[in-house]
């Protein structure tokens, strides 16, 4: 049987995008008799932050940087290539401190920097709120590329996150990675979309701009696949679950259902007063 610590750790690790603070508040309320339990969950918070590519703004900085296992240094510090800095990070409070200069050195330095430059143009064009990074890994023999985009709309009861991770191998110009989408909708219900798309590709040029371009092509293709899947679900499986007449005894224009606010427009009035 799992211990209380293991159970609570699973709550932290499974927190939906943008809702970790809410999960922590619930944990505090549920474990008020053991107030020190939260301080024992450091490994769970670290796993969440690194796997979810949590972003943080450095003191004095304007752009978010990524927390990941690929950007990790020793003693709880992380680094960012674009700002040439390293920093301490508190996984529980999600705050950065003690920013220091960090100059990247190694065989893949030029490739990493050119990849970051290529990613900058791509991300700024296609994502309204995103962070990106490239890091040498596996004894400087490969390059990890990370992109994360968050969209939080708690007033409309939904939050979402796009995460993509790619490993580029210069020895054969190959890219292997995955794109993960996590969306949580929780107005008068609890629906969570989780997707995981495996990506394999080749960068014939072997350059940073070529890596960014190949990533762009694959992510655009996956976005189109997602859009088609949503349309197929709406017109197929979901349509078969719909009532001919809902409990309101009024027919619903299902082709416009995406524009309805659940609990308000469907119910014919405000769901919260």
From Swiss-Prot:
Q: Where, if anywhere, are coiled coils annotated?
A: none
Q: Which GO terms describe its biological process?
A: actin cortical patch organization; actin cytoskeleton organization; barbed-end actin filament capping; mating projection actin fusion focus assembly; mitotic actomyosin contractile ring assembly; mitotic actomyosin contractile ring contraction
InterPro entries xrefs: CapZ_alpha, CapZ_alpha/beta, CapZ_alpha/beta_2, CapZ_alpha_1, F-actin_cap_asu_CS
The GO cellular component terms are: actin cortical patch; cellular bud tip; cortical cytoskeleton; F-actin capping protein complex; incipient cellular bud site; mitotic actomyosin contractile ring
Keyword Cytoplasm on entry: yes
Q: Pfam families, per this entry?
A: F-actin_cap_A
What is the superkingdom listed in this entry's lineage? Answer: Eukaryota
Binding partners and assembly: Component of the F-actin capping complex, composed of a heterodimer of an alpha and a beta subunit.
Its biological purpose: F-actin-capping proteins bind in a Ca(2+)-independent manner to the fast growing ends of actin filaments (barbed end) thereby blocking the exchange of subunits at these ends. Unlike other capping proteins (such as gelsolin and severin), these proteins do not sever actin filaments.
Similarity comment: family membership: Belongs to the F-actin-capping protein alpha subunit family.
This protein's name: F-actin-capping protein subunit alpha
Q: From which source organism is this entry?
A: Neurospora crassa (strain ATCC 24698 / 74-OR23-1A / CBS 708.71 / DSM 1257 / FGSC 987)
The opening ranks of the lineage are:
Eukaryota, Fungi, Dikarya, Ascomycota, Pezizomycotina
